[in-house]
Amino acid sequence: MKKKEIVDDVTMKRAITRITYEIIERNKSLDNLVLAGIKTRGVYLARRIQERLKQLEGIELPIGELDIKPFRDDMKVEEDTTDMPFDINGKDVILVDDVLYTGRTIRAAIDNLVSLGRPARVGLAVLVDRGHRELPIRADYVGKNIPTSSIEEIVVEVIEVDGKDCVSIVDPS
């Protein structure tokens, strides 16, 4: 198994800043905007976007945490640890995740989101888009496009969970 770091902590910070600027530019008003991080690493990325928005615009967006496990089509988990401490009805929700691959995680996140209410609009921000979609889903905000083969894996590490910030490609062969 070969592991190669392709994004270091500085580059990751820049990618998150780029996503944050794109969110500012593409949304006429941030007043109706909320962030929903997809557990686990998407939550930490959403918090970083929230912090950058606070630094750049002086606004603190509400942030929630989506647990997609109970909504997956490939596993059966009953417990839902979603924490959405605000009403999403009529809100512009930006889902935040670490990697966009087949689209199945995002489908499950949308299923969870609409079970909580009816947002006005749903967008998607991802740190890495690696391609290989199985569902018609695309990200509105992308930190890095990293094409991979179908056997390779993208591993995102965040300091809050893993002790460092980086993105690596793992080749299992």
From Swiss-Prot:
Signal peptide annotation: none
Domain of life according to the entry: Bacteria
Enzyme Commission code: 2.4.2.9
CDD domains reported in the protein's UniProt record: PRTases_typeI
InterPro entries assigned: PRibTrfase_dom, PRTase-like, PyrR, PyrR_bifunctional
Keyword field contains Ligase: no
A GO molecular function held by the record: uracil phosphoribosyltransferase activity
Motif interval(s): PRPP-binding: 93-105
Alphabetically ordered keywords of this record: Glycosyltransferase, RNA-binding, Transcription, Transcription regulation, Transcription termination, Transferase
Keyword Transferase among record annotations: yes
Biological process annotations from GO: DNA-templated transcription termination
Reaction catalyzed: UMP + diphosphate = 5-phospho-alpha-D-ribose 1-diphosphate + uracil
Cited function: Regulates transcriptional attenuation of the pyrimidine nucleotide (pyr) operon by binding in a uridine-dependent manner to specific sites on pyr mRNA. This disrupts an antiterminator hairpin in the RNA and favors formation of a downstream transcription terminator, leading to a reduced expression of downstream genes.
Subunit relationships: Homodimer and homohexamer; in equilibrium.
UniProt record similarity statement: Belongs to the purine/pyrimidine phosphoribosyltransferase family. PyrR subfamily.
Protein name (database record): Bifunctional protein PyrR
Gene: pyrR
